[in-house]
Amino acid sequence: MANIKSQIKRNLTNEKRRLRNKAVKSELKTHVRRFRDAVDAGDVERAGETLRIASRKLDKAVSKGVIHANQAANKKSALARTHANLAAS
């Protein structure tokens, strides 16, 4: 446990941020999983819709500073590639 007042405040702030980031990441994983479920089911239309939502959530996570921009770009690219392969087949 910290003794310095400023560090005690930082610990509280860090805990709030950790919980907020955890919620954003959890929501992100949920939407990516929904996209993958739609792809596994072979539903092109639902996959396209969930891809848009997942991309939006990834961009939102970047703007909130939860994930790095390159990580979001890499994930969006992989999801789009998966959707394109599904639509082509």
Curated annotation (Swiss-Prot):
It comes from the Bacteria. One of its GO terms (cellular component) is small ribosomal subunit. Residues 1-22 are annotated as: Disordered. GO terms for biological process: translation. The keyword Ribosomal protein applies. InterPro entries: Ribosomal_bS20, Ribosomal_bS20_sf. Gene3D superfamilies: Ribosomal protein S20. Residues 1-11 have a biased composition (Polar residues). GO terms for molecular function: small ribosomal subunit rRNA binding; structural constituent of ribosome. Keywords: Ribonucleoprotein, Ribosomal protein, RNA-binding, rRNA-binding. SUPFAM superfamilies: Ribosomal protein S20 (SSF46992). The keyword Transmembrane does not apply. Belongs to the bacterial ribosomal protein bS20 family. Binds directly to 16S ribosomal RNA. This is Small ribosomal subunit protein bS20. The lineage of its organism: Bacteria, Bacillati, Actinomycetota, Actinomycetes, Frankiales. The gene is rpsT.
